[in-house]
């Protein structure tokens, strides 16, 4: 049996958590951590953020991000090592709708309320 890919295991663990800290980077390299909801999407992860947010602007110029399991308030446990990743953004309506459905299935009512705000 082939050995499990540790990246896949990390992706599964992150996708199963309630929140991850998504850290994007300003042009000057300064990190900007934000707790976000996350859902597994094949061998990657998907998150949602409204159009025009700082996260999207930063990902647009610097796709390098780090992700780590965190609390709702964004606290990362001392023993958690952030995972380096590459983020992409989409505004394709079909893709946004598909990811929104995945998040709604995982988070239920709290996600639906979030989408109303």
Task: Indicate residue ranges for each PLM-predicted region.
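Extreme N-terminal tail/first-helix region
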Residues: 1-21
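A generic local structural motif
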Residues: 6-9, 32-34, 52, 116
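Short, structured beta-strand-loop surface elements
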Residues: 52-115
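Residue-level detector of intrinsically disordered, flexible termini
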Residues: 2-3, 9, 45, 84-86
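Short beta-strand segments
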Residues: 17-51, 59, 66-69, 79-84
